[in-house]
Amino acid sequence: MLWLLLVLIVFIFQTGTILLFEFRKPSKAVAWLFILFCFPLIGFVVYYFVAQDYQKRKMVRKGGSQLFREFRERLWAQSKVIEHVEQMHNPHFKHQERLFNQLIRMSENPLTGCNRTRVLTNGEETFEAMLTSMKHAQHHIHVEFYIFRSDEIGRKFQEVMIRKAREGVKVRFIVDGVGSYNLPYSFIRTCSEAGVEFHYFLPPFFATLDRRINYRNHRKIVVVDGMIGFVGGINVGDDYLGKYPKVGFWRDTHLQIEGDSVYFLQNAFLSDWKLASGERLMDVNLFPPHTCTGDEEVQILSSGPDQVWDTIQEMCFGALTVAKKRIWITTPYFIPDPGIYEALKLAAVSGVDVKIIIPYQSDSKLVHLASLSYVQELLETGVEFYQYRKGFIHAKVVIVDDLLGSVGTANMDMRSFFYNFELTAVVFANSALERLSADFVEDISNSSRIDLNVFRRRPRSQKTAEILTRMLSPLL
């Protein structure tokens, strides 16, 4: 009887804790109460590690982000910063001042107009562009990935980093402490012995009950000499080249940027370097003056536990609410928060062309089931869903009207929006947006549309599994 009393006490304590800390997020509270009901003895342990935002609040207080504040006046002076809608090349934006003001005011990274971009649509193209830029580095190379494997392509990156370090180029290398947990020590040691500076980003220390395990760095950044930057969905591994038979062809999107917005990719890396290493890099040569090589308007948005605003989620929500003609989304994991979910439904019933591409086969069965749980109600409002059949689609792209497109590291899910360190580039009515739109149309041609009537007839067992996983969706 004593153990039953103990279970009851723990249950009551957990319930009170969850209701106290999660009252502002009812869906999250329901998910945790569901776990508590099913697993009362281990629920609190999981909640301790995964749910609470103590560590997040600590990171915000540290002010670890936006390290370039000391350089702000200098950087703004040497950048073509756009502060008013009249400065935009995009005539459509003059009718969307509310969204423009939101983007300007909610992100400390300004919108800049002196950029040239290149959309990269697969691993082969992306890795070639990255490695070529790295080989020509003169001052520094900054490399940061969520997943970095020691396979064939990983060794090619290693070779270039080592060669450039021996030539005197400063090479800094970050990988996430969970996403790249299996990166061999021998691989890291070889890099370090050659002069490459390496750090894990917030590696969890289970012996000390470290809550940082919930806050992962999902960013993929390469910056070369402060002049060329890369951001998008591609990690470093042979699977991103389609070399894993179980996965097959890997469809992804990355963006190469030259120009003023590289400053803010650099700033994101330096913020992460500070959190990973404790070193505050304040070298002015990390932000060299740029020769204006293009006139594309780009804004870099970063979000994570070190930020007050959930900037990427708020950008997506704001863009969806002003859409007039189309909302096209590509995402490997579709677990929208309530705001995004309602915005999609309202857009569809208002006559906006809403199309969403998701994988036919996912690399996560649990997440895939949770994603499907959102499909039927959205189909009933007029949203069109397509399942990519050519292989696995991992791109994270949002296109709204002829107004803007985003390419980045954030999935359309709650973990990316509210917990992970993420990075997104927003492009405005330029050649990059045209390329993203053309790629989306091609991806549709390699996909099958989900028919509402057929989807309604899916097996009861699948519907049950979807319901159960959806209850966990705020945690996935």
Model-derived features with residue positions:
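Catalytic-core elements of nucleic-acid end-processing and repair enzymes
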Residues: 396
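Short glycine/threonine-rich loop-to-helix capping motif typified by GTGT followed
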Residues: 342, 368-372
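Active-site donor-binding acidic/aromatic loop of nucleotide-activated sugar
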Residues: 385-389
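Helical hairpin unit composed of two closely spaced alpha helices linked by a short loop
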Residues: 323, 333-355, 359-360, 364
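N-terminal localization/anchoring segments of enzymes in phospholipid and broader phosphate metabolism
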Residues: 1-314, 318, 322, 346, ...
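Short alpha-helical functional segments enriched in proximate histidine and acidic residues
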Residues: 330
